[in-house]
């Protein structure tokens, strides 16, 4: 064995398997690119992003951890979101929740 060596199981890794998903169309109405990270509370993203924020409450992007989606000025695209799991507590970001999400 080599220190740090990984022995992954055979087959593909399915991200967020079995999670409910939500697809929203998001447009960048600003004049600069906006990047959103994998675990950012999507409802609290940059206000220049135009989408149904109420529907996005309690959701994050359905992308691999540590990655991000970039929205160029004037660009609109569909994104897939998954709900926060665990205790469903959202703290920080833009300070709009800072506690337990209502279900």
From Swiss-Prot:
Its main location: cytoplasm. Transmembrane segments: none annotated. One of its GO terms (molecular function) is urease activity. It comes from the Bacteria. It is found in: Cytoplasm. Its EC number is 3.5.1.5. One of its GO terms (biological process) is urea catabolic process. Keywords: Cytoplasm, Hydrolase. The keyword Hydrolase applies. Heterotrimer of UreA (gamma), UreB (beta) and UreC (alpha) subunits. Three heterotrimers associate to form the active enzyme. Belongs to the urease beta subunit family. NCBIfam families: PRK13203.1, urease_beta. This is Urease subunit beta.
């Amino acid at each position: 064995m080599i220190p740090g060596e990984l022995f992954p199981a055979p087959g593909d890794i399915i991200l967020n398997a079995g999670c409910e998903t939500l697809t929203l169309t998001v447009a960048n109405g600003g004049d600069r690119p906006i990047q959103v990270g994998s675990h950012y509370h999507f409802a609290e993203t940059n206000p220049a992003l135009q989408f149904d924020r109420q529907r996005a409450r309690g959701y994050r992007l359905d992308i691999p951890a540590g990655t991000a989606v970039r929205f160029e000025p004037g660009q609109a695209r569909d994104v897939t979101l998954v709900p926060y799991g665990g205790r469903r507590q959202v703290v920080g970001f833009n300070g709009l929740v800072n506690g337990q999400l209502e279900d």
